[in-house]
Amino acid sequence: MKPFLKKVADVYALNEADRLYKYCFVLPNRRSRVFFESYLSDALNDKHSIFPELTTISDFIDEYSDLVEAGRVEQLFLLYQAYRTLAECDQKQYDDFDHFLHLGDMLLNDFNDIDRYMVDAKELFFNMRNLENIKTDYLSDEQIAVIKEYWGVDKKEVKEDSLFVQSSYVNLWDNMYELYNSFLQALEEKGLTYGGQSYRRVAEKINKMGADDFNFERIIFVGFSTLSNAERMIFERFKKLGIADFYWDFESAFLDKDNKGSYFLNQYIPEFKSIYDIMDSKPTVPNINILSVPSGSGQGLVVRSVLEQLVAENKLDVSDAVNTAIVLPEEKYVNSVLDSVPEMFKSINITMGMSVGQSPIASFLTNLANLEHRKKELKGELSYFYEDVEMLASHPYAVMVGGTGINDLVGEIHRKNAYFVPKSMIAEGGRDLSDLFGINEEEPMVYVERILTRINSALEKDKNNLIERYFVVQYMQALNQIKTVMNRFNVHVEKQSLFFLLSRTMSGAIVPFEGKPLHGLQIMGVLETRSLDFKNIIVLSMNEKVFPTKHYTKSFIPNSIRSAYG
């Protein structure tokens, strides 16, 4: 079967070779762009033609945007600044940044969705303000946690006191439209924006432009699936101007109105039609084998077995394995898969990189954050929950920062059967663990900087720790970015908030692997497979809530309201 992207490349090379330089092809991501470029280059091999513009949807949006996307931390500080200014104007008390942080993070999610889906913000906030019979049933654990954090009440009280929830909820949305506008104004004054707002502004901008305002005679959108309302508006405008063409990756056999998986394509295909017919007259049905594996980590061994079997059956050429993909819905198994690939495969291309969130330093900082979160003042003395101390001690980085004294402390906890570990116990027997626990009441930024510096210095002594050091250096750079933004906004944060900001800054960050996309065995995440076709596909973790992933929306907008606004 001919790959989808190759079909599009071939039909344009055949019919439009002399006009391609006037066209722009827009694809979902960089991965699909690379493959399409290769297919088009092959198709034009014997033709005299100037190559067209090839871009991704995100780069396309950036091209028409007059603002730069701000980092998440800067967005949070700007939102807090707008909130504080509004509170001062209304002569109301306002919370410090630590109190506001989790609420602000959730509001940024809501603002982003509101704009990406072209929702009338004023109307939405009015409806949220007047939502009748608000009950606690729809509240997720995340929402309850934020209410507890922001209004200073217990989760149990939130669940039991629906009147409190209603009044707090209404209070939240009272000035939300004003806050939303103030936030947008603050961003624009600095030449900044955020993802959803960028999509909205570009969609509105393109909607006012004519065909002659673009540098291309035709813009071809290839391989999209689910569209946001902003993307759909862009598609509709280009269609109306008569300068668009659309190609959807689907098999007619799967376009069943009762199949939820084809719900969106059933809408898009009749509305955004293709100039050329690239459908196969006889759709092929894949040969699917399902293998049961008793453990997640054991999947790597099964991958090895499957690869060896494909080679033995002449279904896979080790010298040209680009048509075989290993797809990982769970990034954490990338190392076990790499270790399991047979040595006969000399070339491997890993497109997903290694997640910073799966690194040792990430787990160590999580342990420190948990330690900080559950500490208490007992009998006038700062005390830590014993499980958090034990978890911290079990991490190899704990010794790098605090020495072997941390292991002595765990032994003392067991001997005394302590439930909470007071500050005095930590210092018993001459144990100097103040740097690890940060109990000298120093600035949180100084504390975390020292932690990262000590770990980095310890890792420097062994050349085999290059990847771990890279992760630590990434966190050090992120911390410096946060420090710069904090100084600019003159905001102080506590340790717990600093750990949260670090986590948000590094969210989604990866260590990229160097490779040749068009050579070797392909190892990738699910989203990177969009618009791509392979002869052999090995998908791990085909379990419920993993594939597809169960998404929990961190939002204050109930699902019923979300559905009403599309």
Label every model-predicted segment.
Residues M1-I61, S65-G71, I219, F235-E236, ...:
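Anion-coordinating catalytic cores for phosphoryl-, nucleotidyl-, and glycosidic chemistry
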Residues M1-L5, M209-D212, K240:
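Short, Lys/Arg-enriched, disordered terminal segments
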Residues R30-D213, N229, D408:
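Basic/charged alpha-beta structural segments of nucleotide/phosphate-handling enzymes
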Residues K159-Q185, D258-V285:
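Short, compositionally biased "basic patch" segments
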Residues N171, D212, R218-P270:
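Extended, H/D-rich, highly charged conserved domains that either
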Residues E189-L192, A244, S347:
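Residue-level detector of anion-binding/catalytic polar loops
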Residues K190, L241, T529:
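Residue-level signal for short amphipathic helical patches enriched in basic/charged
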